[in-house]
Amino acid sequence: MSEQKVVICKDLKSELQDFLSSLKYDKLFILMDTNTKEKCFPLVEDIPAFQKAPILVMEAGDMNKGFVSLAQIWTALSNEGASRNSLLVNLGGGMITDMGGFAGATFKRGIRTINIPTTLMASVDAAVGGKTGINFNGLKNEVGSFYPPLCVFIDCDFLRTLDRDNILSGYAEMIKHGLISSMENYASVMLFDIDTMNYSYLNSLVGQSVAVKERIVEEDPKEQGIRKALNFGHTIGHAFESLSFLKMRPILHGHAVAAGIVSELYLSHKLCGFPMEKLSQVVYYIKEYYPALFFDCTDYDTLYELMTHDKKNEGGIINFTLLKNVGDVRINQSVTKEKILESLDFYRESFGI
């Protein structure tokens, strides 16, 4: 898998234009969703390389990250004369960078892509690392590929277009990055007050978070080992997210991950000795900012069944990434159903559900 370049921009338009000018391509396409077109595209639409570029606009929302939308992208690329020498720019949040990346990976067996994330979630997670995919059969990112973009351009000015819920969604991944990396990173993440929104401090945290993911992906690009650290909070988190879709009450990915972090820290404490003091600190922080996820014991079997479809599983065994301490990651941890259900109890008790 080729190495990707990540640029934390000081002047997005100038840096992006310079990069595009250095490339040879026959046609450039821009993929975005309805939200991005309204709030973000006006910030970059006057870039010279974007003039006359066909624009592909998808309906916003993760429920649209499926095969129907993917086929629409393929059809548009085909109808507009895209070739293997074309370039697809994915301007948007995780839904766009995931699906656009997969469209790029598969159209004519692969065309080059560039990611310009416009959400916090995409900036620190979805757009970086080369994972692409779509939801399928009610499961998150069930079909996809490892296909890194040529470059990821991160401009934190886009974050000012986001509402609080979307900031929270992305910040859950930053909490995860703090927990799996170092005490220094963890402490800085825990200090951020989301309600006061110091964008300058947030920008520095974004750079720190991206560096954590870049380091891990460079070491293990195809998730054979340590890259599984990035799945912390996601085994249960993805189950929460999938359950919300089944109930037709979809929640943002990061809100599900935050809940997954709470449950998986409980498992980390019980099975790996993660310190209770730090567990309590993280639970307090997440309770302070994140809405509670409402579910009860009648949902447990469904949640467990959803976990059995997790991509990290091997031989029918649910594999977790757990922590012995901040920065001390234990991958490929098998957990009994009893303990998993206990962790769901712990979440509900912590949030008074």
UniProtKB/Swiss-Prot annotation:
It is found in: Cytoplasm. Pfam families: DHQ_synthase (PF01761), DHQS_C (PF24621). It catalyses: 7-phospho-2-dehydro-3-deoxy-D-arabino-heptonate = 3-dehydroquinate + phosphate. GO terms for biological process: amino acid biosynthetic process; aromatic amino acid family biosynthetic process; chorismate biosynthetic process. It is an enzyme of class 4 (lyase). Keywords: Amino-acid biosynthesis, Aromatic amino acid biosynthesis, Cobalt, Cytoplasm, Lyase, Metal-binding, NAD, Nucleotide-binding, Zinc. Its cofactor is NAD(+); Co(2+); Zn(2+). Pathway: Metabolic intermediate biosynthesis; chorismate biosynthesis; chorismate from D-erythrose 4-phosphate and phosphoenolpyruvate: step 2/7. Binds 1 divalent metal cation per subunit. Can use either Co(2+) or Zn(2+). Zn(2+) binds at E173, H234, H253. GO terms for molecular function: 3-dehydroquinate synthase activity; metal ion binding; nucleotide binding. GO terms for cellular component: cytoplasm. Its EC number is 4.2.3.4. The keyword Metal-binding applies. NAD(+) binds at residues 60-65, 94-98, 118-119, 131, 140. SUPFAM superfamilies: Dehydroquinate synthase-like. Belongs to the sugar phosphate cyclases superfamily. Dehydroquinate synthase family. PANTHER family: 3-DEHYDROQUINATE SYNTHASE (PTHR43622), 3-DEHYDROQUINATE SYNTHASE, CHLOROPLASTIC (PTHR43622:SF7). Catalyzes the conversion of 3-deoxy-D-arabino-heptulosonate 7-phosphate (DAHP) to dehydroquinate (DHQ). This is 3-dehydroquinate synthase. It comes from Parabacteroides distasonis (strain ATCC 8503 / DSM 20701 / CIP 104284 / JCM 5825 / NCTC 11152). The lineage of its organism: Bacteria, Pseudomonadati, Bacteroidota, Bacteroidia, Bacteroidales. The gene is aroB.
